[in-house]
């Protein structure tokens, strides 16, 4: 089979006659293609017709022929497709519907529809988010989403719970930046935080037994009675608490020390034990745990060092790998060195070794000394923990543990370290805590490491030493402190060494530099100095090579330098406890000292604490300091109020009961009783406080209601209570009783007209009971036996023969307490009340003391001339009621009117004399008509008192 390209008479196709191809267009001859390639020969450029191409280009043209062959088959397929057309069903035919459903299910998803679906889904999501936000905004007030989330504070608490030692730095650390000589800030070097010792299981360790009770009472102590022991403790100002504390001693011979220790004590110039030593040493020798609290310079150090020596000498000697027997823990390096020197002084009598372990010293030297063996280790908490972790020593042989200045260690953040040290020591150890101040919170923490402790307190907790004279200088501003110090520094150095306290390290360096410029030789001590420098400064200060030492609070505790005579608080302390320790550097061991504190007007907060500290130490408090302290609100509120106290109004009704004026309350100037016994009866004890008072109040309100709310008609007969105005109100608020019966009209002669004789006290007693008033009058009483002034006798029980001034005083009292305090009543009292100008006094002036009988006769005659139609036999309140109903004058109708009370007792009718008495009497009646009984008062007649 041959392939025929066609052309000159030859048919195109394969060389078999199976099919024929229709003739098409004649193929046009191909134009010669001009090649622009670089392979074209040079001859072709010059009109050569021969087409010379590279071999690979010819291959390419041959490929083009193959493409033509392939197109032939494509044309054949197109022709065949036109012949065999697919079946296309008609519209709406079942086959078309099946094809549609099939194509819909089998066909791929349209991209546009997929994109639109995505857009709709995203829009729906956005709408849902917007709706949720709207709901959150609507409920934002009632719902807090941050409750479930951990805020900064909760994160801090969680972090502190997971890291209990985080952020615990000594108190002497300052946050301020230090600067070099060029003024560039020095990066602060933070101290390494010391982790506490890990817990230890003491049940897995077998400790050898030891003895800790070495105290035997002296015969002189045993022979003392408990009362003598109590008196001695009171004399020494000691307070001891705890289970079975041992008796205190009063001499070194009572302690039972051997001759070697006593010789060393005498060599140290000790003459007699201090109060804390008198009680503390017996407790320590007995093997008991103790909390010792005493003022600075009271000998606390010797109180635990001497028992240590006795305790150590009873135990076996140290082996090469053994640790110490006694450990003394203190907060500062200076205190550590000082206690170490004391231990060496007293320990050399027994050839005992002591090692001081503190921060800043050579770690290698301290570890070498510990490995060689030492019975006593005086340390700071952090450095001891370092040596224990590095296996330089161990605490298995420790049986005597002392924490000096325990509250200071807890305040400095050493609580966890202190607890870990105590937990690493055997549980049956002996533990002692000493301090000058001991807050209750720190005491509670300290009791956790003690077993049945005995608390020994000398003086008040945190009080200042009375041997120290404290002087407080109040200056207007800070620069004035410098002027004050430079003027007095030479005077201070002439008496002894001077210690100047400054709060901040930068201020201490600045003050020291300024003093050096003024040619004052001094030393500087603060926490950022190297330990060698600090040791050299303290050594020079003790040797008196430098008279002045400027220091921060690192020198405030435990620094025992006897040459210090003056302490100057250039800056006030952070708290009053630090102030107590500051001034305690002087006046030690019974010596006298002076402490100056410089205050400015801005430091009123500390002034309040300072006032209490001075008062507790019996020091003088200046008026300027007290005024400055009073500027502080908490001190002003908590300060006691000096001066006279408020007088309590204590009546028969109970504490704070105040008698109401205008209701017949007793005055302090006038008595209402007729004799002395009546006043005494008013203060009879009541059977029940609340019961009597309640009943008295009920009766008082009931009587007041009946007195005030009466009939409006003047002709209405008044009830008995409306005219019972002679009974005064008692302190319990009750009304007095009145006679229950009256003598018949006309039985008594006109001259006699006596009042009730045995009217003891017009009112209730303090217990709310009725006073004794007779229920009737005697049948025949002469006027000479019962004068008119009997009812209104003085408090001392004056008889009828007293002068008329008594009537005048009582009339004044009735006018004050009986009348109402309304303006109308006061006006009537002022113009028409004749009680202050009673007829008895005026009649006494005219007749030279004729007596009250003539006054009463004249009064009765005058009253009869006025047409008041009084009956001679009736002298009580009943006549007053009938008389007021006839005359239409409401003089006796109101219980508030003092005239009604006076005339119901039968006395007011004898108060008027002559015409003057008539005018006064009528004016009184007309002025007293402003009551509830008569709504419209009548016109008042003009009297002589109107002018």
From Swiss-Prot:
GO terms for molecular function: ATP binding; ATP hydrolysis activity; mRNA binding; RNA helicase activity. Residues 805-929 have a biased composition (Basic and acidic residues). Keywords: ATP-binding, Coiled coil, Cytoplasm, Helicase, Hydrolase, Nucleotide-binding, Nucleus, RNA-binding. ATP binds at residues 294-301. It comes from the Eukaryota. Residues 1-18 have a biased composition (Gly residues). It is found in: Cytoplasm; Nucleus. It catalyses: ATP + H2O = ADP + phosphate + H(+). PROSITE patterns: DEAD_ATP_HELICASE, HELICASE_ATP_BIND_1, HELICASE_CTER, Q_MOTIF. Gene3D superfamilies: P-loop containing nucleotide triphosphate hydrolases. InterPro entries: DEAD/DEAH_box_helicase_dom (IPR011545), Helicase_ATP-bd (IPR014001), Helicase_C-like (IPR001650), P-loop_NTPase (IPR027417), RNA-helicase_DEAD-box_CS (IPR000629), RNA_helicase_DEAD_Q_motif (IPR014014). Transient component of the SF3B subcomplex of the 17S U2 SnRNP complex. This is ATP-dependent RNA helicase DDX42. It comes from Xenopus laevis (African clawed frog). The gene is ddx42.
